UniProtKB/Swiss-Prot annotation:
Membership in a protein family: Belongs to the UPF0114 family.
Annotated TM spans: 15-35, 53-73, 109-126, 136-156
Protein name: UPF0114 protein PputGB1_0714
Organism: Pseudomonas putida (strain GB-1)
Membrane topology: Multi-pass membrane protein
Locations listed in the record: Cell membrane
Gene Ontology cellular component list: plasma membrane
Pfam family, one: UPF0114
Entry keywords, A to Z: Cell membrane, Membrane, Transmembrane, Transmembrane helix
Family annotation (NCBIfam families): HI0507
First-listed, main subcellular location of the protein, grouped into a coarse class: membrane
InterPro entries named among the record's database cross-references: UPF0114, UPF0114_bac
């Protein structure tokens, strides 16, 4: 009975595979939105103010960071929890493939969240004259919560590895 239960639990890891595939569909949707934004801004690039152009570029950077985060979670999560990727040695291989454990993945995710939050905060500050002080204060508090959380996670990770 114990062996059957253990084998069933071990096999259940494959339930994560469609979830990771779903993330790739999310990446496709993000790429479509990215290029929709590019196509939308290009015809109007000369009519945009510098601040508006910077906001669009920050939005594109934000989407690229989220896309990188999706790829990282999708591939390393699959490798850590489902199955090792069998990639031909003759093909191009990401240098972190097979080296990112769940602890380092958490740190990369935390760093990405801080970077994404920073871009959102910069976007908010660029329009600060039209935003209430309370909203700005809460945005900074939330961002600092992300920063402190990432720092604490890194510190705890360092403590547990030594």
């Amino acid at each position: 009975m114990e062996r059957i239960l253990e084998n069933a639990m071990y096999a259940s890891r494959w339930l994560l595979a469609p979830i990771y595939f779903g993330l790739s569909l999310g990446l496709l949707a993000l790429a479509l939105k990215f290029f929709q934004e590019v196509v939308h801004v290009l015809p109007n690039v000369f009519a945009l103010s510098e601040a508006d152009l910077i906001l669009v570029i920050l939005s594109l950077i934000d989407m690229s960071l989220v896309g990188g985060l999706l790829v990282m979670v999708m591939i390393s999560g699959y490798e850590n929890f489902v199955s090792q990727l069998d990639i031909d040695e003759s093909k191009e291989k990401l240098n972190w493939l097979g080296k990112m454990d769940s602890s380092s993945l958490k740190m990369k995710v935390a760093a990405s969240i801080v970077a994404i939050s920073s871009i959102h905060l910069l976007r908010v500050f660029m329009d600060a004259q039209n935003i209430s002080t309370d909203y700005l204060m809460w945005y900074v508090i939330i961002h600092m919560t992300f920063v402190i959380s990432a720092f604490c996670m890194g510190y705890l990770d360092k403590l547990t590895k030594h």
